[in-house]
Amino acid sequence: MTVGITTSITRHPLVWGVAWSLVFGAALVVAVMLDWHGLIDWLLIGLLVLPSTIATVLVLAATPRTHFEAMSSVFSHFFVRYLALVFGLTAWGLSVVVGAAISQSIQLAAEQREDEIIGIGFDLMLVVVPLVAALLWAAFVVRCAWFLVRVRGWAEVPTADRVPEHLFASRPALRRIVVGLAHPALFAATGLVVAIAGPSAVGTLEITF
């Protein structure tokens, strides 16, 4: 039975990757609905993205930068950087607006009670920092997914790709699984789930006036 499962994973790595993500995604939904401990939420999020993230890191880490320069057109080169700048500008603008809101909220909530100002500030930061981090993570995921498209394409198991031959050259079955799991759509979907679910897993903010 173990041999059969291993063979199936080798032949259809993307299908198994999607199934893995769906199982832990469903478990995450149940955990959120039943209000389980936050550590369980983070554990499920980590397990959900584990296969595609590890595979993506292995593929992109093995691919030299010269490969991307050879594959990129002038348009794609500037378009990806444009998207990165948009995400960066949005994150900066959000930090400025939220920073002003934090200052005002602390003053209003504390009502000249200096001993509570620091505590309120930390509570607000526990909400703001995860939101900004999630936005930057989303930008990182989109950029890596774009690189994956350029390196290995959209096929489940590409017959011709630009992944360096030295990546698991002596273990073709493992190479097939890694390249299959490093699918741009799978990595983008699971990565964006983290960007959406991550801030909510930190907890909700409650300030008593």
Features from the language model and the residues they span:
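Short alpha-helical packing/oligomerization segments
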Residues: 116-162
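Transmembrane alpha-helical segments of multi-pass membrane proteins
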Residues: 12-19, 73-97, 169-186
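Long amphipathic alpha-helical segments with strong coiled-coil/leucine-zipper propensity
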Residues: 47, 58-113
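Cytoplasmic membrane-interface regions of multi-pass membrane proteins
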Residues: 1-6, 56-81, 142-175
